[in-house]
C-alpha cells in the first residue's frame, strides 16, 4: 500500500472552487462524471491556478467544464466547504497527494441558452448534463459529497426560491 494512503488523515486538502450554476427557472446545472461507472451527478468544480483569484478560477473552470461562461456571479460562500474522498480513491486522484477538497463556492446565474452548453470540451469531465432541483441533485450526488452539497445549497437557498 502507498505510504501516502497509509497516512490518509495527514494528507492536506486540495484547494479549489465549486459552482452552483442556476438557470432562469432556478434549476441547478449537474453533470455526470465521464470517469464514473455509476449514475452519480455533481456540480462543476475545479482547482485554482497559482495567482488566480477565486472568481477568475470559477469562470475559467465553468468554461473548461461546460464550454460556456455566459454568466454572472451572484454570491460567494461565506464559508469554505470540504469533503474527504474515500480511501480507495486516493490513489486514483491527484497523485495520492490529497485526502479531499476544500472549496470556496459560488452561486452563478447562467445567462446563456441550453444550446450554449457544450460538455465535449478539450478535456471533458461530463458524459451528460441536465438541470435539476436541489433535492434531485442531493439524492443523485456521490454519497461523499451529499453533506457538502446540502450545506452549500442551504447557504444559497434564498437565491433558489
Swiss-Prot record:
Enzyme class name: hydrolase
Known EC number: 3.6.1.-
Keyword set, alphabetical order: Hydrolase
Recorded name of the encoding gene: rppH
Family annotation (Pfam families): NUDIX
Lineage of the species this protein comes from: Bacteria, Pseudomonadati, Pseudomonadota, Alphaproteobacteria, Rickettsiales
Motif (Nudix box): 46-67
InterPro entries (UniProt xref): NUDIX_hydrolase-like_dom_sf, NUDIX_hydrolase_CS, NUDIX_hydrolase_dom, RppH
SUPFAM superfamilies assigned: Nudix
Cofactor requirements of the protein: a divalent metal cation
GO BP terms in the entry: nucleoside phosphate metabolic process; ribose phosphate metabolic process
Protein name per the record: RNA pyrophosphohydrolase
Domain Nudix hydrolase: residue ranges: 12-154
PANTHER family registered for this protein in UniProt: NUDIX HYDROLASE 26, CHLOROPLASTIC, UDP/ADP-SUGAR PYROPHOSPHATASE
Family classification: Belongs to the Nudix hydrolase family. RppH subfamily.
Function, in words: Accelerates the degradation of transcripts by removing pyrophosphate from the 5'-end of triphosphorylated RNA, leading to a more labile monophosphorylated state that can stimulate subsequent ribonuclease cleavage.
Organism in which the protein naturally occurs: Orientia tsutsugamushi (strain Boryong)
Molecular-function GO terms, alphabetical: bis(5'-adenosyl)-pentaphosphatase activity; guanosine-3',5'-bis(diphosphate) 3'-diphosphatase activity
Amino acid at each position: 500500500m502507498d505510504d501516502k494512503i497509509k497516512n490518509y488523515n495527514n494528507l492536506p486538502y486540495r484547494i479549489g472552487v465549486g459552482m452552483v450554476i442556476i438557470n432562469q427557472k432556478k434549476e441547478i446545472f449537474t453533470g455526470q462524471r465521464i470517469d464514473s461507472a455509476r449514475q452519480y451527478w455533481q456540480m462543476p468544480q475545479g482547482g485554482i491556478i497559482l495567482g488566480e483569484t477565486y472568481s477568475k478560477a470559477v469562470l475559467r473552470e465553468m468554461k473548461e467544464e461546460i464550454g460556456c461562461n455566459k454568466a454572472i456571479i451572484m454570491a460567494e460562500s461565506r464559508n469554505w466547504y470540504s469533503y474527504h474522498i474515500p480511501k480507495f480513491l486516493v490513489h486514483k486522484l491527484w497523485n495520492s497527494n490529497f485526502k479531499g477538497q476544500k472549496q470556496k463556492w459560488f452561486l452563478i446565474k447562467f445567462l446563456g441558452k441550453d444550446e450554449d452548453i457544450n460538455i465535449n470540451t478539450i478535456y471533458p469531465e461530463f458524459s451528460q448534463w441536465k438541470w435539476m432541483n436541489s433535492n434531485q441533485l442531493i439524492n443523485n450526488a456521490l454519497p461523499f459529497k451529499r453533506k457538502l452539497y446540502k450545506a452549500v445549497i442551504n447557504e444559497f437557498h434564498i437565491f433558489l426560491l
